[in-house]
Amino acid sequence: MADETKPTRKGSPPIKVYCLPDERRAIEEKAAAAGMSLSAYLLAVGQGYKITGVVDYEHVRELARINGDLGRLGGLLKLWLTDDPRTARFGDATILALLAKIEEKQDELGKVMMGVVRPRAEP
């Protein structure tokens, strides 16, 4: 039998696409958001694959910070609920402020989560 080799992408002719500079910039931004090269992004989109973006590391870091804050606030609330002697000096105003702070952190967490999800869901 003859020695047959499989064709590779590098050995195949490229497909040229004409676009305006702002269109190219938009495509490059979407490829970068997906963590892909421009070529890999266009190949995947052209074949109908659903592109999933890479979560922004700043959002992840912020979510971790808020989660830690909620854990600390929850620990304080737990101490108060168990009538721990260390929390005997806490008055009702302090506990209400703690509950308000927990609610504020939960709202902040929701906003950051929407910031992660919303850009990926909209075109």
UniProtKB/Swiss-Prot annotation:
Keyword check for DNA-binding: yes
Major location category of this protein: cytoplasm
Pfam families associated with the record: NikA-like
Keywords: Conjugation, Cytoplasm, DNA-binding, Plasmid
Annotated GO CC locations: cytoplasm
GO molecular function: DNA binding
Location in or out of the cell: Cytoplasm
Stored InterPro entries: NikA-like (IPR053842)
The protein's assembly and partners: Monomer.
Function: Transfer of plasmid RP4 during bacterial conjugation requires the plasmid-encoded TraJ protein, which binds to a 19-base pair invert sequence repetition within the transfer origin. TraJ protein is bound to only one side of the DNA helix. This nucleoprotein structure is the initial complex in the pathway to assemble a functional relaxosome.
Protein name: Protein TraJ
